[in-house]
């Protein structure tokens, strides 16, 4: 299990939505990422939750802020601790917000065919994108906004599909995160209808790659779900994706992908009203130490969840779900929620 806890857009660092911290803050922090309920997956392809995460089928709500980026800029997504058992593809889509609509109030419906794929990576040379490749990149995945893309407001949908239980449907686990970006630049192209899908609708139980046995022992390729990658209308070939190759995603620089990186420089000017300023500090996945026997130990909720992931990972392919869950729940019962202290350091609020 996991989620994107930090994103670097055009060289600027933004803190992602923190599901175990933000809801308990007052006021609730404003983000460029749409809220997610936690680090768990979506498994039902018919629910609106498959679009940008959520629970109960209602999806998620727009975020308050917008990041600014030029067409051709890179976006680097930093993930929380990702279990090595959760093999699968890493896929990124973008969806253009309709004209005369503000992204901070726009929630696509399941019938809105707006999503086009800008990056994908699956299985190549014995390595899975979500585990082998991403872990070698400090839990970071980097994509490029197509240079040909016309200016406008876009939702960037970044996901991992975990295949460790995908022998049948339902089984595959989907982890989508959505970010709000104002794209600038001289680009003039909008993807044609052949490149667009809806969510739900972009994947079905019979889509190649949705069911897949990763334990067969004879894997040579993997059919990545969804349409082909769009970089321009001229380059787009149409049809269904059958790519099994890892993308040419570049390794993010150490200043963009590290959860312990130094504070980002404040942007000298906002791109537009409601635009997000870069994070004043890079919040790591977990800064609290592991649970200790001492009653004075401060345990961050993210540490509880990361230890839960490791417990599940260690028991694959048949983990002790009840035991790992009980340990997680006991940890969370006494956990605190990591936040920025007034001193600017991570920890409990100091007064």
Curated annotation (Swiss-Prot):
Reactions this protein catalyses: [(1->4)-beta-D-glucosyl]n+m + reduced acceptor + O2 = 4-dehydro-beta-D-glucosyl-[(1->4)-beta-D-glucosyl]n-1 + [(1->4)-beta-D-glucosyl]m + acceptor + H2O
Q: Please provide the Gene Ontology terms (biological process) for this protein.
A: cellulose catabolic process
Any one Gene Ontology molecular-function term assigned to this protein's record: metal ion binding
Q: What EC number(s) is this enzyme filed under?
A: 1.14.99.56
Q: List residues binding O2.
A: 164, 173
Q: Which GO terms describe its cellular component?
A: plasma membrane; side of membrane
User: What is the membrane topology noted in the UniProt record heading this document?
Assistant: Lipid-anchor; GPI-anchor
The lineage's top-level taxon is Eukaryota
Residues covalently joined to lipid (GPI-anchor amidated serine): 280
Q: Per its UniProt entry, what is the enzyme's top EC class, as one word?
A: oxidoreductase
Q: Which residues form the signal peptide?
A: none
Disulfide bond positions: 52-178
Residues binding Cu(2+): 1, 86, 175
A single Pfam family it belongs to is AA9
Co-factor remark: Binds 1 copper ion per subunit.
Q: Which UniProt keywords apply?
A: Carbohydrate metabolism, Cell membrane, Cellulose degradation, Copper, Disulfide bond, Glycoprotein, GPI-anchor, Lipoprotein, Membrane, Metal-binding, Monooxygenase, Oxidoreductase, Polysaccharide degradation
The keyword Cell membrane is annotated on this UniProt entry: yes
The positions flagged as glycosylation sites are 53, 138
Practical and industrial applications = Lignocellulose is the most abundant polymeric composite on Earth and is a recalcitrant but promising renewable substrate for industrial biotechnology applications. Together with cellobiose dehydrogenases (CDHs) an enzymatic system capable of oxidative cellulose cleavage is formed, which increases the efficiency of cellulases and put LPMOs at focus of biofuel research.
Record carries keyword S-adenosyl-L-methionine:
no
**Job description of the protein:** Lytic polysaccharide monooxygenase (LPMO) that depolymerizes crystalline and amorphous polysaccharides via the oxidation of scissile alpha- or beta-(1-4)-glycosidic bonds, yielding C1 or C4 oxidation products. Catalysis by LPMOs requires the reduction of the active-site copper from Cu(II) to Cu(I) by a reducing agent and H(2)O(2) or O(2) as a cosubstrate.
Q: Family assignment?
A: Belongs to the polysaccharide monooxygenase AA9 family.
Name-wise, this protein is AA9 family lytic polysaccharide monooxygenase A
User: From which organism does this entry originate?
Assistant: Gloeophyllum trabeum
């Amino acid at each position: 299990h996991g989620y994107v806890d930090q994103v670097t857009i055009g060289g600027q660092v933004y803190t992602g939505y923190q599901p175990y911290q933000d809801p308990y803050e007052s006021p609730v922090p404003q983000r460029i990422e749409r809220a997610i309920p936690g680090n768990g997956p979506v498994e039902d392809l018919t629910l609106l939750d498959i679009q940008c995460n959520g629970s109960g089928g209602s999806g998620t709500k727009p975020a308050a802020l917008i990041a600014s980026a030029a067409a051709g800029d890179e976006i680097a997504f930093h993930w929380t601790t990702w279990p090595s058992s959760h093999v699968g593809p890493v896929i990124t889509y973008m969806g253009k917000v309709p004209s005369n609509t503000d992204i901070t109030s726009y929630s696509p419906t399941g019938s809105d065919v707006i999503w086009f794929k800008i990056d994908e990576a699956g299985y190549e040379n014995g390595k899975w994108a979500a585990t082998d490749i991403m872990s070698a990149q400090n839990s970071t995945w980097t994509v490029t906004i197509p240079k040909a893309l016309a200016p406008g407001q876009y939702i960037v949908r970044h996901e991992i599909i975990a295949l460790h239980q995908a022998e049948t449907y339902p089984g595959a686990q989907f982890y989508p995160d959505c970010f709000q970006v104002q794209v600038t630049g001289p680009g003039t192209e909008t993807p044609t209808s052949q490149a667009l899908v809806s969510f739900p609708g972009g994947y079905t139980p019979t889509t190649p790659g949705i069911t897949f046995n990763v334990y067969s022992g004879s894997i040579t390729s993997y059919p990545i779900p969804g349409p082909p990658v769009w970089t321009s209308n001229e380059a787009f070939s149409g049809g269904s994706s059958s790519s099994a190759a890892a993308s040419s995603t570049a390794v993010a620089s150490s200043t963009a992908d590290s959860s312990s990186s130094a504070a980002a420089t404040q942007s000298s000017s906002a791109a537009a009203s409601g635009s997000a300023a870069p994070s004043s500090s890079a919040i790591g996945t977990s800064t609290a130490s592991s649970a200790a026997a001492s009653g004075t130990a401060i345990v961050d909720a993210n540490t509880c969840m990361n230890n839960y992931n490791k417990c599940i990972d260690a028991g694959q392919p048949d983990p002790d779900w009840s035991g790992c869950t009980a340990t997680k729940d006991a940890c969370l019962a006494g956990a605190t929620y990591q936040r920025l202290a007034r001193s600017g350091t991570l920890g409990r609020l100091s007064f």
